[in-house]
A protein has these predicted regions:
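Short alpha-helical segments that sit at the start of domains
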Residues: 5-39
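Short amphipathic alpha-helical elements of helix-turn-helix/winged-helix folds
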Residues: 23, 40-45, 57
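Short capping segments at the starts of secondary-structure elements
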Residues: 31-33, 44-50
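DNA-recognition alpha helix
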Residues: 50-64
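Basic amphipathic alpha-helical segments that dock to polyanions
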Residues: 71-81
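Non-DNA-binding regulatory cores of transcription-related proteins
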Residues: 79-154
Length: 154
């Protein structure tokens, strides 16, 4: 895995915040100052962060308290529009470095430093969906989380 990725550039070379803004506006949603600040906070943290941690960061930048429930609503909008991914086991969020890609969530989560790397593996996702379908289960949002130690922490 190499070094932790703290890049704020989307794969196409567009700044990540601009790619997120473009995707949200394409979906018919406004890119407000609050949404921009929340997205920037998620992207800058570089590892899974709770809504409370994000609210604290945004509150400091705004100079006034931002309620975690407001942050949750915006994070839910971001998740629905593929701008942010939810790390289910930690009830935390990470910026999606590829807002235009629609892949299932596969995370490699470091138990030591907390970093989470999102991996795209359509073959594995297809296998999980097929296994679910074989049992009559309609998978809507497969999430796979693998816990261990990243290359930096080994």
């Amino acid at each position: 895995m190499g070094k932790h990725n703290h890049a704020h550039i989307e794969a196409s070379g567009v700044p990540l915040a601009q790619a997120a803004r473009d995707a949200l506006e394409k979906a018919g949603e406004a890119w407000t100052d609050m949404r921009a600040q929340i997205f920037d906070a998620v992207a800058e943290i570089g590892k899974p962060a709770s809504a409370y941690e994000i609210a604290d960061i945004v509150s400091q930048k705004r100079g006034r308290r931002v309620a975690p429930n407001s942050v949750y609503r915006i994070l839910d909008l971001f998740v629905a529009n593929n701008l942010v991914r939810r790390v289910e086991s930690a009830n935390a969020f990470v910026a999606n470095s590829h807002p235009g890609c629609l892949h299932d969530c596969i995370f490699l989560i470091c138990d030591q430093c907390g970093a989470a790397v999102h991996v795209d593996n359509d073959r594995l996702s297809d296998e999980v969906r097929a296994a679910a379908e074989a049992t009559g289960f309609a998978a809507e949002r497969p999430v796979i989380e693998v816990r261990g130690k990243c290359a930096e922490c080994q």
